[in-house]
Amino acid sequence: MKSRPMADRIYFDNAATTPLDPRVMEAMLPYLTERFGNPSSIYSYGRETRLAIESARKSVAQLLGARPAEVFFTSGGTEASNTAIMASVLDLGCTHIITSPIEHHATLHTVEYLKGRGMVTLEYVHVLSNGHIDMADLEAKLKAAPGKTLVTLMHANNEIGNLTDIHAVGRLCEAAGAIFHSDTVQTVGHYAFNLKETPVHFITGAGHKFHGPKGVGILYVREGTKIHPLIHGGGQERNMRAGTENLYGIVGFAKALELAMASLDEDAARILEVKLYMAERLRETIPGIVFHGDAFGDSLYTVLNAGFPRTERSDMLLFNLDINNVCCSGGSACSSGADIGS
């Protein structure tokens, strides 16, 4: 089927993925053509691509307020979260995990796997009616934890947009001697980080969430946190991630993050204005509509989750929007094949 031109469609699913910025494509193009060397090679082709990767790492670290040695490139957010969670258990001695029931499947399915293998005990922190984490319950669970604990909580929820105060969570973890991993896939590129001042052991990012390429992400590992690789083989990524690097993806990730952070304040104000306008018009037009989460409070400006009154017409809502060239989703893109709601 021939796809429609993007100009003819309205795209409302940027939490799932974003179109590639032409300036990012321009930065990537030389590494798809003449600069094709294997970064592990010692001759000139390899040296120039190695330089590109290390320059990208330095740029990403600077933009996130981290050290270059703390940034590792991965295939995306899922691999990065898997690496952090598995390493917390296998290398850092965590025998207990606290998470929430509304995490991304990259987290939920990983911790459930570890529990199923008998490697950890698992608890879910209470979620308040507005979608926020119950911080008092988290503190109580940390105090009562039966062993060294990993807390894994996302920074911004990919479906309702709620923001979790990762500084507050990190302080609770520090007091309890716990490891803290935060899935920050929705906020890297959309939020100003200073990781040197953030009490977190691991965060994750994915380039395609901020107009970069798919198939490339990052794992931040705080200095002094000693872990082993999830993927074994060669010594790439300073022995932390085997396999020939996604050269053009890494270059694209760094360029996309540079562009995103350069226009962050302007973009955030503009997108928030659109979000609030959309909510206002939906309220005026559709009686009984509800907005899930803390949509107009501690919420990411890029996400709006609306619930429509159940009717025969609403059951066909997404289909009818699609045939009218409006693209939006009824839940996480990673769960779009499931036959149950979010």
Locate the predicted segments by residue.
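Pyridoxal 5′-phosphate
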Residues: 1-342
